Swiss-Prot record:
Phosphothreonine carried by residues: T8, T11, T205
Xref: SUPFAM superfamilies: P-loop containing nucleoside triphosphate hydrolases
Organism whose genome encodes this protein: Rattus norvegicus
GO molecular function, one term: sulfotransferase activity
Tissue specificity as recorded in UniProt: Expressed in the brain, not detected in the liver, kidney, spleen, heart, small intestine or testis.
GN (gene name): Sult4a1
GO CC aspect terms: cytoplasm; cytosol; mitochondrion
Job of this protein: Atypical sulfotransferase family member with very low affinity for 3'-phospho-5'-adenylyl sulfate (PAPS) and very low catalytic activity towards L-triiodothyronine, thyroxine, estrone, p-nitrophenol, 2-naphthylamine, and 2-beta-naphthol. May have a role in the metabolism of drugs and neurotransmitters in the CNS.
Name this polypeptide is given: Sulfotransferase 4A1
Localization (cell): Cytoplasm
Pfam families: Sulfotransfer_1
Length: 284
């Protein structure tokens, strides 16, 4: 698999130079040199994979999945480093070799597009939970995230960043392709496709879906307790006082987008998603 340097003018040079292009997809530098190893990564039937485009509610989803699958409670999760329990496949730490040796059942995360995930996943050898988020809220959160980084800090304006998003020029490539690839596989027996907004609109149904998908059996009282704990996680994650400008809430984009930006975004969205029947709630 060939890798080539990607260079796109009109963005801060420091930010731009960090990325590379792999089979037409812009990827972060820590993915360089390991994509073949990722494709060949051995999966297990007991694995549970959480896959998202960045800033799609990954942190919240991983906590809910951990709670449902492990029977943990929110206080316990709050005291642990959950990222150690659910490593990201392509990140430098802990690395592929260590993830390979983790005891089963492994919980593994990734932001990679469907086509770059381990080939065994395509054969249905492990369970995959994918969560998508409406792209307007996502791009605001992604911008705030990049502004906060030290090594990959983005110093341009939100308008510039949003244009990059619409033109598929951010890390992990096109959001539009990312979600549509997984949407096409939503009926696969080993795939559960979720939407971030449903955590806020109908958490009960989502928890029930997760429990069934993960093979977790519980009586009515246990399910009610599980749902109550998940509500606590959602409330903690989306507390507007705890996060910059209420980063986890639905409809965040309305505080940031101008009328002109929104019109341009809607046009691009229609062009790139027009043939797809996947829909999103942009506010609740």
């Amino acid at each position: 698999m060939a890798e080539s340097e990607a260079e796109t003018p009109g963005t801060p040079g420091e930010f731009e130079s960090k990325y590379f292009e792999f089979h037409g997809v812009r990827l972060p530098p820590f993915c360089r040199g390991k994509m073949e190893d990722i494709a060949d990564f051995p999966v297990r039937p007991s694995d549970v994979w959480i896959v998202t485009y960045p800033k799609s509610g990954t942190s919240l989803l991983q906590e809910v999945v951990y709670l449902v699958s492990q029977g943990a409670d929110p206080d316990e999760i709050g005291l642990m480093n959950i990222d150690e329990q659910l490593p990201v496949l392509e990140y430098p730490q802990p690395g592929l070799d260590i993830i390979k040796e983790l005891t089963s059942p492994r919980l593994i995360k990734s932001h990679l597009p469907y086509r770059f995930l381990p080939s065994d996943l395509h054969n249905g050898d492990s369970k995959v939970i994918y969560m998508a988020r409406n792209p307007k809220d996502l791009v605001v959160s992604y911008y705030q995230f990049h502004r906060s980084l030290r090594t990959m800090s983005y110093r341009g304006t939100f308008q510039e960043f949003c244009r990059r998003f619409m033109n598929d020029k951010l890390g992990y490539g096109s959001w539009f392709e990312h979600v549509q690839e997984f949407w096409e596989h939503r009926m696969d027996a080993n795939v559960l496709f979720l939407k971030y907004e449903d955590m806020h609109r109908d958490l009960v149904t989502m928890v029930e879906q997760l429990a069934r998908f993960l093979g977790v059996s519980c009586d009515k009282a246990q399910l009610e307790s599980l749902i109550e704990h998940c509500h606590q996680l959602v409330d903690q994650c989306c507390n507007a006082e705890a996060l910059p400008v209420g980063r986890g809430r639905v409809g965040l984009w309305k505080d940031i987008f101008t009328v002109s930006m929104n019109e341009k975004f809607d046009l691009v969205y229609k062009q790139k998603m027009g043939k797809c029947d996947l829909t999103f709630d942009f506010y609740l």
